[in-house]
């Protein structure tokens, strides 16, 4: 049990986007992408940068790009690409039903570490009137369009002029091109 003086570690939040397709994906890479819920090309997930998740991202380094997402971009992704179970769009009315005032409030709470995850687990029991620590029934991935203006190369890393691998805060520019 943690003492009252100990702080909970707040890991950075990363957006991870799959850029390479399904054919010729090795089995171990496909399994890791499946664990990250990146089952299709141009699908994005937002993850907490814990050591175990970072190990999975390093393993699929040649299939994805990732970087630190900011609250404004996350709010825009939730507004435009957020889906709830039944493939219905995530709306402001739905958020208000669960006690959230805006997309920006949810995004800021997630980025700051106030809430641990955006999407609740399947067995989450929501109570009316209480604000949950996540968005009930939100799908844990976002389907994006191919980027406007295209990609440089899905065979080279970002550091050498391609698109794969770590790109830091510049991931926000790519996400905005893909909305």
UniProtKB/Swiss-Prot annotation:
On the tree of life, the source organism's domain of life is Archaea
| Record keywords, A-Z | Ribonucleoprotein, Ribosomal protein
An annotated Gene Ontology molecular function: structural constituent of ribosome
- CDD domains, sorted: Ribosomal_L7_archeal_euk
State any GO CC term.
cytosolic large ribosomal subunit
* The keyword Ribonucleoprotein is assigned to this record: yes
Pfam families reported in the protein's UniProt record: Ribosomal_L30
Per the record, the GO terms for biological process are: maturation of LSU-rRNA from tricistronic rRNA transcript (SSU-rRNA, 5.8S rRNA, LSU-rRNA); translation
Q: Which InterPro entries match?
A: Ribo_uL30_ferredoxin-like_sf, Ribosomal_uL30, Ribosomal_uL30_arc, Ribosomal_uL30_euk_arc, Ribosomal_uL30_ferredoxin-like
| SUPFAM superfamilies for this protein | Ribosomal protein L30p/L7e
Family membership noted in the UniProt record: Belongs to the universal ribosomal protein uL30 family.
Q: How does it assemble?
A: Part of the 50S ribosomal subunit.
Q: Could you identify this protein by its name?
A: Large ribosomal subunit protein uL30
Its gene? rpl30
